[in-house]
Curated annotation (Swiss-Prot):
Disulfide-linked positions: none
Classification via PROSITE patterns: DNAJ_2
Record-linked Pfam families: DnaJ (PF00226), HSCB_C (PF07743)
Function: Co-chaperone involved in the maturation of iron-sulfur cluster-containing proteins. Seems to help targeting proteins to be folded toward HscA.
Gene3D superfamilies according to UniProt: DnaJ domain, HscB, C-terminal domain
Species whose genome carries this gene: Pseudomonas putida (strain W619)
Record note on quaternary structure: Interacts with HscA and stimulates its ATPase activity.
CC terms in the record's Gene Ontology section: iron-sulfur cluster transfer complex
Family assignment from sequence similarity: Belongs to the HscB family.
GO BP annotations, alphabetical order: [2Fe-2S] cluster assembly; protein complex oligomerization; protein folding
InterPro entries, alphabetized: DnaJ_domain, HscB, HscB_C_sf, HscB_oligo_C, J_dom_sf
Protein name as it appears in the record: Co-chaperone protein HscB homolog
Protein keywords: Chaperone
């Protein structure tokens, strides 16, 4: 028995654009059904199955609620496995990455919380644009390489967004 499709667990068709509020609501409903505590008096086998179902549900939810992880997953179930670590041959984006990192470093050095807020808005807009671009091409076989490039960019911006949140917390203290 293979692992069920993450989308199928939530009664969804594979697609990139998801209503994350509905996904969260459905997750909570399903989590209550398979929570291991509900099987405390069940047999050891039933407890193990409940634990496995709960873990699979958690993994599926974490994957689907994250745009970069959802993008990678969609490519994988479409037969386009993307290695985790690969050299990026995208000079324009590499230059953009360097510029963003330098700007973030300057904001940190200057302890510029307002500047960080502006940077965060620009980053969010860039993420939204990548999400739209990916949504338009992920299921077009001729555009799978483009979709992979976009997914890698999404991963970078997601990591950068985490760094921005951490910087905000440090500057806010």
């Amino acid at each position: 028995m293979g692992t069920p499709c993450h989308f199928a667990l939530f009664d969804l068709q594979p697609c990139f654009r998801l209503d994350l509020d509905k996904l969260a609501t459905r997750y909570r409903e399903l989590a209550r059904e398979v929570h291991p505590d509900r099987f405390a008096d069940a047999s050891e086998r039933e407890q193990r199955v409940a634990l496995e179902k709960s873990a699979a549900l958690n993994d599926a939810y974490q994957t689907l609620r994250s745009a970069p992880r959802r993008a990678r997953y969609l490519l994988a179930i479409g037969g386009h496995e993307v290695p985790q670590e690969v050299t990026v041959h995208d000079p324009d984006f590499l230059l953009q990455q360097m510029q963003w990192r330098e700007e973030l470093e300057e904001l940190q050095d200057e302890a510029d919380l307002d500047g960080v807020a502006v940077f965060k808005k620009r980053l969010k807009a860039a993420q939204e644009q990548l999400n739209e671009d990916f949504a338009a091409c992920w299921d077009v076989p001729a555009e799978r390489d483009k979709a992979e490039r976009l997914m890698r960019r999404m991963q970078f911006l997601d990591k950068l967004a985490q760094e921005v949140r951490q910087l905000e917390e440090r500057l806010d203290d």
